[in-house]
A protein has these predicted regions:
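Short intrinsically disordered, low-complexity coil segments enriched in acidic
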Residues: 1-5, 196-198, 216-217
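Subtilisin-like serine protease catalytic core
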Residues: 1-85, 100-104, 132-136, 148-149, ...
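Substrate-binding/access-modulating region of protease and related hydrolase catalytic domains
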Residues: 78-155, 159-201, 210
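Solvent-exposed serine/threonine-rich low-complexity stretches and specific carbohydrate-binding patches
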Residues: 204-217
Length: 217
C-alpha cells in the first residue's frame, strides 16, 4: 500500500521530479530493495509506523484497524527545515494528483522549531494555501505538556544573547541543511546577528548586526 517514499537525507538520488536533493523510491520493487530510510538525526524508531498504523492500518491479525484502512501511503523522511517540509508537502500533492487520490497529510512530528507558532511561519502559510486546494492536514494534540522547553519572560534589556545548539555533523554523516528561525514583534524594530564559536568559546566567524523595521506580521 506504500506508493512511494522520499528519503531527503540520502544524496545518491534519483531525486523526485522538480527537486534536486534526496532519493525517491516508487513501486514495490524499489521500496523492497531500499528496505529502510537513511540513518539520520532522528535515529531509527517506530513512531512513523505507529502513527501510520493509527491512520490507515489494515488491522490484519489484530482486533483493531486504522481510520482509513484501505488508504495508500506516501512516506517522507524530511530534513528538519521549513523549506524541506514544504517541499515534502508539494511532492505529496503532485503525487496524489498523479494517482487521482485525495491527500491527507499527517503531521504527528513533535517538532516545535519550525518558526513561530502563531500561524505566520512559512509552514503555516503553506498549510493555509494547500488547505484551500483541498489538502487535509492532521496533527496530534502533543504529549510534551511536562517538558520545559517553552519560556515566557519580559526582559528588561532590549539586547539578548542566546546559545543555539546545532546537530553534530560528525556524528550524523547524512545530516545537511540546518536553519534558525527568528522573528520580532509587529511594528517594532528587530535586529539580529550570528556568531560561530568553537568548544573553547573562541569566535570563529561573526556576521554584522542586521536591523529590520518590521511593519507587518
Amino acid at each position: 500500500r506504500i506508493v512511494a517514499a522520499w528519503d531527503q537525507f540520502k544524496r545518491s538520488g534519483p531525486a523526485p521530479d522538480g527537486f534536486s536533493y534526496g532519493t525517491i523510491y516508487e513501486g514495490e520493487a524499489e521500496l523492497l530493495a531500499a528496505q529502510k530510510d537513511t540513518i539520520n538525526i532522528y535515529g531509527y524508531a517506530t513512531h512513523g509506523s505507529h502513527v501510520a498504523g493509527i491512520a490507515g492500518g489494515s488491522g490484519a491479525g489484530t482486533d483493531h484497524r486504522g481510520v482509513a484502512y484501505e488508504a495508500n501511503y506516501l512516506m517522507v523522511t524530511f530534513l528538519a527545515d521549513e523549506a524541506a517540509v514544504i517541499d515534502a508537502f508539494s511532492w505529496m500533492k503532485a503525487k496524489a494528483k498523479e494517482y487521482g487520490k485525495r491527500l491527507v497529510i499527517n503531521m504527528s512530528w513533535g517538532l516545535y522549531n519550525l518558526g513561530p507558532l502563531d500561524g505566520t511561519s512559512l509552514v503555516s502559510q503553506a498549510i493555509d494555501q494547500m488547505s484551500s486546494d483541498g489538502v487535509i492536514f492532521v496533527t496530534s494534540g502533543g504529549n510534551n505538556g511536562d517538558e520545559t522547553f517553552h519560556i515566557k519572560k519580559t526582559f528588561a534589556n532590549d539586547t539578548l544573547s542566546s546559545l543555539v545548539e546545532f546537530y553534530n555533523y560528525a556524528a550524523n554523516a547524512n545530516m545537511w541543511g540546518q536553519s534558525i528561525s527568528m522573528w520580532g514583534e509587529e511594528g517594532k524594530t528587530f535586529g539580529t546577528g550570528f556568531s560561530v564559536y568553537d568548544n573553547s568559546k573562541k569566535v570563529l566567524v561573526a556576521s554584522p548586526l542586521y536591523d529590520l523595521a518590521i511593519t507587518s506580521g
